[in-house]
Amino acid sequence: MERYILSLDQGTTSSRAILFNKNGEIVHIAQREFKQYFPKPGWVEHNANEIWGSILAVIATVLSEASVQPEQVAAIGITNQRETTVVWDKHTGLPIYNAIVWQSRQTADICEQLKQQGYDELFRKKTGLLIDPYFSGTKVKWILDNVEGAREKAEKGDLLFGTIDTWLIWKLSGGRAHVTDYSNASRTLLFNIHTLQWDDEILNILGIPKSMLPKVRPSSEVYAKTIPHHFFGVEVPIAGAAGDQQAALFGQACFEEGMAKNTYGTGCFMLMNTGEKAVQSKHGLLTTIAWGIDGKVEYALEGSIFVAGSAVQWLRDGLRMIKKASDSETYAEKVDSTDGVYVVPAFVGLGTPYWDSDVRGAVFGLTRGTTKEHFIRATLESLAYQTKDVLAAMEADSGIALKTLRVDGGAVKNNFLMQFQSDMLGVPVERPVINETTALGAAYLAGLAVGYWKDRKEIASQWQLERQFEPQMAKEKQEQLYAGWKKAVKAAMAFK
Protein backbone atom coordinates (compact mmCIF):
# COMPACT_ATOMS: atom_id res chain seq x y z
CA MET A 1 0.00 0.00 0.00
CA GLU A 2 1.52 3.31 -1.08
CA ARG A 3 1.65 5.96 1.65
CA TYR A 4 1.42 9.73 1.24
CA ILE A 5 1.88 12.89 3.28
CA LEU A 6 -1.09 15.25 3.46
CA SER A 7 -0.21 18.93 3.60
CA LEU A 8 -2.85 21.41 4.78
CA ASP A 9 -2.03 24.88 3.46
CA GLN A 10 -4.33 27.37 5.17
CA GLY A 11 -3.93 30.70 3.35
CA THR A 12 -5.41 34.18 3.53
CA THR A 13 -8.08 33.66 0.86
CA SER A 14 -8.30 29.88 0.49
CA SER A 15 -7.52 26.54 2.12
CA ARG A 16 -5.76 23.81 0.20
CA ALA A 17 -5.01 20.16 0.79
CA ILE A 18 -2.11 18.68 -1.18
CA LEU A 19 -1.00 15.05 -1.24
CA PHE A 20 2.73 14.41 -1.76
CA ASN A 21 4.49 11.13 -2.51
CA LYS A 22 7.90 9.83 -1.43
CA ASN A 23 9.68 11.79 -4.21
CA GLY A 24 8.20 15.08 -3.01
CA GLU A 25 5.91 15.18 -6.05
CA ILE A 26 2.33 16.47 -6.03
CA VAL A 27 -0.24 13.68 -6.32
CA HIS A 28 -3.35 15.84 -6.08
CA ILE A 29 -4.56 19.29 -4.93
CA ALA A 30 -7.95 20.43 -3.61
CA GLN A 31 -8.74 24.07 -2.91
CA ARG A 32 -11.62 26.03 -1.40
CA GLU A 33 -11.98 29.78 -0.98
CA PHE A 34 -13.71 31.28 2.05
CA LYS A 35 -15.24 34.62 2.93
CA GLN A 36 -13.35 37.78 3.88
CA TYR A 37 -15.01 40.20 6.30
CA PHE A 38 -14.29 43.95 6.34
CA PRO A 39 -16.30 45.35 9.29
CA LYS A 40 -14.61 48.79 9.08
CA PRO A 41 -12.05 50.43 6.76
CA GLY A 42 -8.64 48.80 7.29
CA TRP A 43 -10.11 45.88 9.28
CA VAL A 44 -9.86 42.34 7.88
CA GLU A 45 -11.43 39.34 9.61
CA HIS A 46 -12.20 35.66 8.95
CA ASN A 47 -14.68 33.32 10.58
CA ALA A 48 -12.52 30.62 12.24
CA ASN A 49 -15.32 28.05 11.95
CA GLU A 50 -15.58 28.74 8.20
CA ILE A 51 -11.82 28.15 7.93
CA TRP A 52 -12.25 24.85 9.80
CA GLY A 53 -15.13 23.89 7.48
CA SER A 54 -13.02 24.66 4.42
CA ILE A 55 -10.22 22.44 5.77
CA LEU A 56 -12.59 19.49 6.32
CA ALA A 57 -13.95 20.00 2.79
CA VAL A 58 -10.53 20.00 1.08
CA ILE A 59 -9.38 16.94 3.04
CA ALA A 60 -12.45 14.99 1.86
CA THR A 61 -12.08 16.26 -1.72
CA VAL A 62 -8.37 15.53 -2.12
CA LEU A 63 -8.68 11.96 -0.79
CA SER A 64 -11.74 11.08 -2.87
CA GLU A 65 -10.48 12.69 -6.11
CA ALA A 66 -7.07 11.02 -5.76
CA SER A 67 -8.70 7.69 -4.76
CA VAL A 68 -6.51 7.58 -1.66
CA GLN A 69 -7.76 5.81 1.47
CA PRO A 70 -7.42 7.66 4.82
CA GLU A 71 -5.16 4.77 6.04
CA GLN A 72 -2.68 5.66 3.28
CA VAL A 73 -1.92 9.03 4.88
CA ALA A 74 1.33 8.57 6.85
CA ALA A 75 1.17 12.02 8.48
CA ILE A 76 -0.36 15.49 8.25
CA GLY A 77 1.68 18.70 7.99
CA ILE A 78 0.15 22.13 8.52
CA THR A 79 1.25 25.49 7.16
CA ASN A 80 -0.69 28.68 7.65
CA GLN A 81 -1.18 32.38 7.09
CA ARG A 82 0.88 33.75 9.95
CA GLU A 83 -0.11 36.17 12.74
CA THR A 84 -3.88 35.72 12.18
CA THR A 85 -5.39 35.42 15.65
CA VAL A 86 -8.14 33.18 17.06
CA VAL A 87 -9.43 33.28 20.65
CA TRP A 88 -11.89 30.56 21.65
CA ASP A 89 -13.70 29.13 24.67
CA LYS A 90 -11.94 25.93 25.72
CA HIS A 91 -15.16 24.33 27.02
CA THR A 92 -17.45 24.98 24.03
CA GLY A 93 -14.68 25.09 21.39
CA LEU A 94 -16.33 28.20 19.92
CA PRO A 95 -14.40 31.34 18.94
CA ILE A 96 -15.51 34.38 20.96
CA TYR A 97 -14.79 36.74 18.04
CA ASN A 98 -13.81 36.52 14.37
CA ALA A 99 -10.20 35.67 13.56
CA ILE A 100 -8.31 38.97 13.17
CA VAL A 101 -6.22 38.65 10.00
CA TRP A 102 -2.54 39.60 9.68
CA GLN A 103 -3.44 42.42 7.24
CA SER A 104 -5.91 44.01 9.66
CA ARG A 105 -4.96 47.43 11.03
CA GLN A 106 -7.58 47.52 13.80
CA THR A 107 -4.97 47.59 16.57
CA ALA A 108 -3.12 50.65 15.19
CA ASP A 109 -4.14 52.74 18.24
CA ILE A 110 -2.83 50.12 20.70
CA CYS A 111 0.48 50.03 18.78
CA GLU A 112 0.71 53.82 18.78
CA GLN A 113 0.26 53.91 22.57
CA LEU A 114 2.94 51.25 23.10
CA LYS A 115 5.38 53.22 20.95
CA GLN A 116 4.63 56.43 22.83
CA GLN A 117 5.33 54.59 26.09
CA GLY A 118 8.79 53.84 24.67
CA TYR A 119 8.45 50.05 24.33
CA ASP A 120 9.80 49.81 20.76
CA GLU A 121 13.31 48.66 21.63
CA LEU A 122 12.19 46.22 24.35
CA PHE A 123 9.84 44.40 21.95
CA ARG A 124 12.41 44.39 19.13
CA LYS A 125 15.18 42.97 21.32
CA LYS A 126 13.04 40.18 22.78
CA THR A 127 10.85 39.21 19.81
CA GLY A 128 12.87 40.32 16.75
CA LEU A 129 9.73 42.14 15.54
CA LEU A 130 8.47 45.72 15.39
CA ILE A 131 5.45 47.02 17.29
CA ASP A 132 2.94 46.81 14.45
CA PRO A 133 -0.74 45.77 14.04
CA TYR A 134 0.58 43.01 11.73
CA PHE A 135 1.57 40.74 14.65
CA SER A 136 -0.74 38.73 16.94
CA GLY A 137 0.00 40.24 20.37
CA THR A 138 -2.02 43.43 20.04
CA LYS A 139 -4.83 41.51 18.30
CA VAL A 140 -5.24 39.29 21.40
CA LYS A 141 -5.30 42.39 23.61
CA TRP A 142 -7.92 43.99 21.33
CA ILE A 143 -10.21 40.93 21.64
CA LEU A 144 -9.84 40.85 25.45
CA ASP A 145 -10.55 44.60 25.64
CA ASN A 146 -13.47 44.70 23.20
CA VAL A 147 -15.44 41.45 23.57
CA GLU A 148 -17.83 41.56 26.51
CA GLY A 149 -16.76 39.30 29.38
CA ALA A 150 -13.62 38.15 27.55
CA ARG A 151 -11.12 39.47 30.06
CA GLU A 152 -12.90 37.82 33.04
CA LYS A 153 -13.06 34.51 31.16
CA ALA A 154 -9.38 34.76 30.25
CA GLU A 155 -8.38 35.47 33.87
CA LYS A 156 -10.35 32.36 34.94
CA GLY A 157 -8.43 30.26 32.41
CA ASP A 158 -11.46 29.58 30.18
CA LEU A 159 -10.08 31.04 26.94
CA LEU A 160 -7.42 29.77 24.54
CA PHE A 161 -5.42 31.73 21.98
CA GLY A 162 -3.85 30.37 18.85
CA THR A 163 -2.59 31.28 15.43
CA ILE A 164 -4.27 29.26 12.65
CA ASP A 165 -1.94 26.25 13.04
CA THR A 166 -2.90 25.98 16.72
CA TRP A 167 -6.63 26.26 15.96
CA LEU A 168 -6.46 23.51 13.30
CA ILE A 169 -4.37 21.13 15.45
CA TRP A 170 -6.80 21.71 18.36
CA LYS A 171 -9.80 20.95 16.11
CA LEU A 172 -8.25 17.94 14.33
CA SER A 173 -7.17 16.41 17.64
CA GLY A 174 -10.59 16.95 19.22
CA GLY A 175 -9.20 19.48 21.69
CA ARG A 176 -6.41 17.19 22.91
CA ALA A 177 -3.49 19.34 21.77
CA HIS A 178 -3.11 23.09 22.32
CA VAL A 179 0.26 23.64 20.65
CA THR A 180 2.12 25.83 18.19
CA ASP A 181 5.55 25.52 16.61
CA TYR A 182 8.56 27.80 17.10
CA SER A 183 8.13 29.54 13.72
CA ASN A 184 4.52 30.56 14.40
CA ALA A 185 5.25 31.51 18.02
CA SER A 186 7.97 33.86 16.78
CA ARG A 187 5.32 35.90 14.88
CA THR A 188 3.07 36.64 17.85
CA LEU A 189 5.07 39.52 19.44
CA LEU A 190 4.70 37.56 22.70
CA PHE A 191 7.55 35.07 22.32
CA ASN A 192 11.14 35.67 23.38
CA ILE A 193 13.16 34.25 20.48
CA HIS A 194 16.34 34.03 22.60
CA THR A 195 15.01 32.25 25.72
CA LEU A 196 12.43 30.34 23.58
CA GLN A 197 9.70 31.09 26.14
CA TRP A 198 6.56 33.22 26.22
CA ASP A 199 7.79 36.54 27.63
CA ASP A 200 6.25 37.44 31.03
CA GLU A 201 7.19 41.11 30.79
CA ILE A 202 5.48 41.54 27.42
CA LEU A 203 2.42 39.54 28.58
CA ASN A 204 2.15 41.93 31.55
CA ILE A 205 2.43 45.02 29.36
CA LEU A 206 -0.35 43.73 27.08
CA GLY A 207 -2.46 42.24 29.89
CA ILE A 208 -2.59 38.74 28.41
CA PRO A 209 -2.91 35.79 30.85
CA LYS A 210 -0.31 33.08 30.19
CA SER A 211 -2.94 30.34 30.60
CA MET A 212 -4.34 31.30 27.15
CA LEU A 213 -1.15 30.47 25.31
CA PRO A 214 -0.31 27.20 23.54
CA LYS A 215 2.71 25.02 24.32
CA VAL A 216 5.55 25.80 21.91
CA ARG A 217 6.99 22.71 20.21
CA PRO A 218 9.47 21.87 17.42
CA SER A 219 8.24 22.28 13.83
CA SER A 220 8.73 18.56 13.15
CA GLU A 221 7.19 16.36 15.83
CA VAL A 222 4.02 14.30 16.39
CA TYR A 223 1.77 16.78 18.26
CA ALA A 224 -1.29 14.53 18.42
CA LYS A 225 -3.37 12.21 16.27
CA THR A 226 -6.56 13.08 14.44
CA ILE A 227 -9.68 11.98 16.29
CA PRO A 228 -11.38 9.30 14.17
CA HIS A 229 -14.59 11.24 13.47
CA HIS A 230 -12.60 14.09 11.88
CA PHE A 231 -10.56 11.77 9.66
CA PHE A 232 -12.87 9.04 8.37
CA GLY A 233 -12.40 6.74 11.34
CA VAL A 234 -8.60 6.86 11.25
CA GLU A 235 -6.04 8.25 13.71
CA VAL A 236 -3.32 9.96 11.66
CA PRO A 237 -0.30 11.70 13.25
CA ILE A 238 -0.34 15.50 12.98
CA ALA A 239 3.42 15.75 12.75
CA GLY A 240 4.61 19.07 11.35
CA ALA A 241 3.76 22.78 11.43
CA ALA A 242 5.33 26.02 10.24
CA GLY A 243 4.20 29.50 9.21
CA ASP A 244 3.81 29.83 5.44
CA GLN A 245 7.03 31.75 4.71
CA GLN A 246 9.19 29.54 6.92
CA ALA A 247 7.59 26.44 5.36
CA ALA A 248 8.54 27.79 1.91
CA LEU A 249 12.15 28.26 3.08
CA PHE A 250 12.13 24.60 4.19
CA GLY A 251 10.42 23.42 0.99
CA GLN A 252 13.10 25.23 -1.03
CA ALA A 253 15.72 23.21 0.92
CA CYS A 254 17.44 26.41 2.13
CA PHE A 255 19.12 24.48 4.93
CA GLU A 256 22.55 26.15 4.85
CA GLU A 257 23.36 29.46 6.48
CA GLY A 258 23.16 32.23 3.86
CA MET A 259 20.66 30.45 1.58
CA ALA A 260 17.59 32.54 0.75
CA LYS A 261 14.24 32.35 -1.01
CA ASN A 262 11.79 34.97 -2.21
CA THR A 263 8.07 34.20 -2.49
CA TYR A 264 6.24 36.39 -5.00
CA GLY A 265 2.61 36.30 -3.90
CA THR A 266 0.22 39.18 -3.16
CA GLY A 267 3.28 40.66 -1.47
CA CYS A 268 6.87 39.39 -1.44
CA PHE A 269 8.50 37.67 1.50
CA MET A 270 12.21 37.08 1.41
CA LEU A 271 13.86 34.91 4.06
CA MET A 272 17.54 34.17 4.59
CA ASN A 273 18.67 31.30 6.80
CA THR A 274 21.09 32.66 9.44
CA GLY A 275 21.74 29.30 11.13
CA GLU A 276 21.72 29.05 14.90
CA LYS A 277 22.22 32.75 15.51
CA ALA A 278 19.47 35.35 15.74
CA VAL A 279 20.84 38.32 13.78
CA GLN A 280 19.42 41.63 15.05
CA SER A 281 18.68 43.88 12.08
CA LYS A 282 19.85 47.47 11.80
CA HIS A 283 18.13 47.89 8.44
CA GLY A 284 14.43 47.28 9.03
CA LEU A 285 14.38 43.48 8.68
CA LEU A 286 12.58 41.16 11.09
CA THR A 287 14.49 38.52 13.04
CA THR A 288 12.41 35.38 13.10
CA ILE A 289 12.65 31.69 13.88
CA ALA A 290 12.95 29.58 10.73
CA TRP A 291 12.09 26.27 12.43
CA GLY A 292 12.85 24.05 15.37
CA ILE A 293 14.08 20.60 14.33
CA ASP A 294 16.53 17.90 15.49
CA GLY A 295 16.69 19.49 18.95
CA LYS A 296 17.86 22.84 17.56
CA VAL A 297 16.27 26.15 16.64
CA GLU A 298 17.43 27.92 13.49
CA TYR A 299 16.80 31.57 12.69
CA ALA A 300 16.11 33.70 9.62
CA LEU A 301 16.11 37.33 8.58
CA GLU A 302 12.89 38.35 6.86
CA GLY A 303 12.00 41.22 4.58
CA SER A 304 8.38 42.01 3.77
CA ILE A 305 7.26 43.77 0.59
CA PHE A 306 3.57 44.64 0.83
CA VAL A 307 2.74 44.91 -2.89
CA ALA A 308 4.02 42.46 -5.52
CA GLY A 309 1.51 40.29 -7.40
CA SER A 310 -1.21 42.71 -6.35
CA ALA A 311 0.47 45.39 -8.52
CA VAL A 312 -0.14 43.14 -11.54
CA GLN A 313 -3.77 42.65 -10.42
CA TRP A 314 -4.01 46.46 -10.27
CA LEU A 315 -2.82 46.70 -13.91
CA ARG A 316 -5.54 44.17 -14.79
CA ASP A 317 -8.51 45.19 -12.62
CA GLY A 318 -7.84 48.82 -11.64
CA LEU A 319 -6.25 50.26 -14.79
CA ARG A 320 -7.54 47.60 -17.23
CA MET A 321 -4.23 47.71 -19.11
CA ILE A 322 -4.09 43.91 -19.40
CA LYS A 323 -6.71 41.15 -19.62
CA LYS A 324 -4.78 38.51 -17.68
CA ALA A 325 -1.70 38.58 -15.46
CA SER A 326 0.47 36.73 -18.00
CA ASP A 327 -0.09 39.56 -20.55
CA SER A 328 2.20 41.75 -18.44
CA GLU A 329 5.21 39.75 -19.65
CA THR A 330 4.21 40.10 -23.32
CA TYR A 331 3.81 43.88 -23.07
CA ALA A 332 7.01 44.38 -21.03
CA GLU A 333 9.04 42.47 -23.65
CA LYS A 334 7.80 44.81 -26.44
CA VAL A 335 10.00 47.70 -25.23
CA ASP A 336 13.73 47.81 -24.45
CA SER A 337 13.32 49.90 -21.31
CA THR A 338 10.73 51.87 -19.35
CA ASP A 339 12.01 55.03 -21.07
CA GLY A 340 12.78 56.56 -17.66
CA VAL A 341 9.44 55.67 -16.01
CA TYR A 342 9.41 54.41 -12.39
CA VAL A 343 6.34 53.06 -10.58
CA VAL A 344 6.49 53.02 -6.76
CA PRO A 345 3.59 50.69 -5.82
CA ALA A 346 3.19 51.92 -2.23
CA PHE A 347 -0.58 51.32 -2.18
CA VAL A 348 -0.52 50.40 1.52
CA GLY A 349 2.75 52.06 2.44
CA LEU A 350 6.23 50.55 2.10
CA GLY A 351 7.62 47.61 4.09
CA THR A 352 11.28 46.62 4.48
CA PRO A 353 13.56 48.55 4.74
CA TYR A 354 11.44 51.75 4.85
CA TRP A 355 8.53 50.80 7.14
CA ASP A 356 6.53 53.87 6.15
CA SER A 357 2.79 53.24 6.32
CA ASP A 358 1.80 56.77 5.20
CA VAL A 359 3.53 56.86 1.81
CA ARG A 360 1.26 56.16 -1.19
CA GLY A 361 1.83 54.92 -4.73
CA ALA A 362 3.49 57.20 -7.26
CA VAL A 363 4.69 57.27 -10.88
CA PHE A 364 7.71 59.29 -12.07
CA GLY A 365 9.29 60.16 -15.40
CA LEU A 366 6.19 60.26 -17.61
CA THR A 367 6.52 62.03 -20.98
CA ARG A 368 4.25 62.40 -24.01
CA GLY A 369 6.10 59.40 -25.44
CA THR A 370 5.23 57.07 -22.53
CA THR A 371 3.18 54.06 -23.64
CA LYS A 372 1.21 51.34 -21.91
CA GLU A 373 4.17 49.00 -22.50
CA HIS A 374 6.53 51.34 -20.62
CA PHE A 375 4.07 51.60 -17.73
CA ILE A 376 3.56 47.83 -17.43
CA ARG A 377 7.30 47.18 -17.64
CA ALA A 378 7.95 49.79 -14.92
CA THR A 379 5.38 48.11 -12.66
CA LEU A 380 7.07 44.70 -13.05
CA GLU A 381 10.51 46.23 -12.53
CA SER A 382 9.33 47.74 -9.22
CA LEU A 383 9.00 44.19 -7.80
CA ALA A 384 12.66 43.51 -8.61
CA TYR A 385 13.82 46.85 -7.19
CA GLN A 386 11.97 46.23 -3.92
CA THR A 387 13.59 42.78 -3.67
CA LYS A 388 17.01 44.39 -4.21
CA ASP A 389 16.22 46.82 -1.35
CA VAL A 390 15.54 43.85 0.92
CA LEU A 391 18.60 41.89 -0.18
CA ALA A 392 20.87 44.91 0.40
CA ALA A 393 19.55 45.08 3.98
CA MET A 394 20.08 41.33 4.46
CA GLU A 395 23.65 41.38 3.22
CA ALA A 396 24.45 44.39 5.43
CA ASP A 397 22.93 42.75 8.55
CA SER A 398 24.25 39.21 8.08
CA GLY A 399 27.60 39.95 6.47
CA ILE A 400 26.74 37.15 4.02
CA ALA A 401 26.86 37.78 0.26
CA LEU A 402 24.05 35.90 -1.48
CA LYS A 403 25.21 33.31 -4.03
CA THR A 404 21.83 32.46 -5.60
CA LEU A 405 18.19 33.30 -4.91
CA ARG A 406 15.55 30.56 -4.99
CA VAL A 407 12.11 31.82 -5.98
CA ASP A 408 8.50 30.64 -5.77
CA GLY A 409 4.95 32.00 -5.88
CA GLY A 410 2.58 33.06 -8.67
CA ALA A 411 4.70 35.79 -10.29
CA VAL A 412 7.76 33.56 -10.87
CA LYS A 413 6.12 32.25 -14.05
CA ASN A 414 6.95 35.68 -15.53
CA ASN A 415 10.27 35.13 -17.34
CA PHE A 416 10.82 38.84 -17.96
CA LEU A 417 10.53 39.58 -14.24
CA MET A 418 12.85 36.71 -13.25
CA GLN A 419 15.52 37.81 -15.75
CA PHE A 420 15.30 41.44 -14.61
CA GLN A 421 15.46 40.24 -10.99
CA SER A 422 18.69 38.37 -11.69
CA ASP A 423 20.12 41.42 -13.49
CA MET A 424 19.26 43.69 -10.55
CA LEU A 425 20.69 41.37 -7.87
CA GLY A 426 23.73 40.33 -9.87
CA VAL A 427 23.21 36.68 -8.82
CA PRO A 428 21.50 33.68 -10.46
CA VAL A 429 17.77 33.27 -9.77
CA GLU A 430 16.63 29.64 -9.47
CA ARG A 431 13.06 28.57 -10.23
CA PRO A 432 12.21 25.05 -8.99
CA VAL A 433 10.13 22.40 -10.75
CA ILE A 434 7.67 22.32 -7.83
CA ASN A 435 6.31 25.79 -7.17
CA GLU A 436 4.12 24.65 -4.22
CA THR A 437 7.06 25.08 -1.86
CA THR A 438 4.98 26.19 1.15
CA ALA A 439 2.87 23.03 1.21
CA LEU A 440 5.94 20.94 0.36
CA GLY A 441 7.82 22.40 3.35
CA ALA A 442 5.00 21.42 5.72
CA ALA A 443 4.90 17.93 4.16
CA TYR A 444 8.66 17.52 4.64
CA LEU A 445 8.46 18.60 8.31
CA ALA A 446 5.67 16.07 8.98
CA GLY A 447 7.33 13.30 6.97
CA LEU A 448 10.65 13.68 8.82
CA ALA A 449 8.86 13.33 12.17
CA VAL A 450 7.40 9.93 11.24
CA GLY A 451 10.40 8.58 9.31
CA TYR A 452 8.74 8.90 5.88
CA TRP A 453 11.88 10.76 4.79
CA LYS A 454 15.18 9.98 6.45
CA ASP A 455 16.82 13.39 6.87
CA ARG A 456 17.32 16.82 5.34
CA LYS A 457 20.00 15.45 3.02
CA GLU A 458 17.42 13.24 1.32
CA ILE A 459 15.05 16.21 1.01
CA ALA A 460 17.75 18.50 -0.44
CA SER A 461 18.46 15.87 -3.11
CA GLN A 462 14.79 16.05 -4.22
CA TRP A 463 14.96 19.78 -4.98
CA GLN A 464 14.90 20.17 -8.78
CA LEU A 465 15.76 23.20 -10.88
CA GLU A 466 13.27 24.10 -13.62
CA ARG A 467 15.16 27.14 -14.95
CA GLN A 468 18.09 29.29 -13.90
CA PHE A 469 18.23 32.99 -14.83
CA GLU A 470 21.78 34.39 -15.03
CA PRO A 471 22.62 38.11 -14.69
CA GLN A 472 23.22 39.65 -18.13
CA MET A 473 23.16 43.41 -17.46
CA ALA A 474 26.31 45.54 -17.29
CA LYS A 475 27.06 46.66 -13.71
CA GLU A 476 27.06 50.33 -14.72
CA LYS A 477 23.57 50.12 -16.22
CA GLN A 478 22.28 48.18 -13.21
CA GLU A 479 23.59 50.84 -10.81
CA GLN A 480 22.11 53.64 -12.90
CA LEU A 481 18.63 52.04 -12.97
CA TYR A 482 18.70 51.29 -9.24
CA ALA A 483 19.80 54.86 -8.42
CA GLY A 484 16.70 56.05 -10.31
CA TRP A 485 14.52 53.76 -8.18
CA LYS A 486 16.04 55.10 -4.93
CA LYS A 487 15.33 58.65 -6.15
CA ALA A 488 11.71 57.73 -6.98
CA VAL A 489 11.13 56.19 -3.52
CA LYS A 490 12.61 59.25 -1.82
CA ALA A 491 10.33 61.54 -3.82
CA ALA A 492 7.25 59.40 -3.06
CA MET A 493 8.06 59.47 0.66
CA ALA A 494 8.37 63.27 0.55
CA PHE A 495 4.86 63.61 -0.90
CA LYS A 496 2.52 63.23 2.08
Curated annotation (Swiss-Prot):
GO (cellular component) term, any one: cytosol
Cross-referenced CDD domains: FGGY_EcGK_like (cd07786)
Q: Where does sn-glycerol 3-phosphate bind?
A: T12, R82, E83, Y134, D244
At the top level, the lineage of the source is Bacteria
Phosphohistidine modified-residue sites = H230
**Database matches in PANTHER family:** GLYCEROL KINASE (PTHR10196:SF69), SUGAR KINASE (PTHR10196)
Q: Per its Swiss-Prot or TrEMBL record, what regulates the activity?
A: Activated by phosphorylation and inhibited by fructose 1,6-bisphosphate (FBP).
What is this protein identified as? Glycerol kinase
Which terms are listed as keywords in the entry? ATP-binding, Glycerol metabolism, Kinase, Nucleotide-binding, Phosphoprotein, Transferase
For binding ADP, which residues are annotated in this chain's numbering?
Answer: T12, R16, T266, G309, G410, N414
PTM text: The phosphoenolpyruvate-dependent sugar phosphotransferase system (PTS), including enzyme I, and histidine-containing protein (HPr) are required for the phosphorylation, which leads to the activation of the enzyme.
Enumerate the residues binding ATP. Answer: T12, T13, S14, T266, G309, Q313, G410
The record's family statement is:
Belongs to the FGGY kinase family.
Quaternary structure per UniProt?
A: Homotetramer and homodimer (in equilibrium).
**Top-tier EC class:** transferase
The reactions it catalyses are: glycerol + ATP = sn-glycerol 3-phosphate + ADP + H(+)
Q: In which pathway does it act?
A: Polyol metabolism; glycerol degradation via glycerol kinase pathway; sn-glycerol 3-phosphate from glycerol: step 1/1
Q: Which InterPro entries match?
A: ATPase_NBD, Carb_kinase_FGGY, Carb_kinase_FGGY_CS, FGGY_C, FGGY_N, Glycerol_kin
Q: What is the lineage of its organism?
A: Bacteria, Bacillati, Bacillota, Bacilli, Bacillales
What are the recorded GO MF terms, alphabetically?
A: ATP binding; glycerol kinase activity
| The EC number(s) this enzyme carries | 2.7.1.30
Detail which positions bind glycerol: R82, E83, Y134, D244, Q245
- Matching NCBIfam families, A to Z? glycerol_kin, PRK00047.1
A Gene Ontology biological process term: glycerol metabolic process
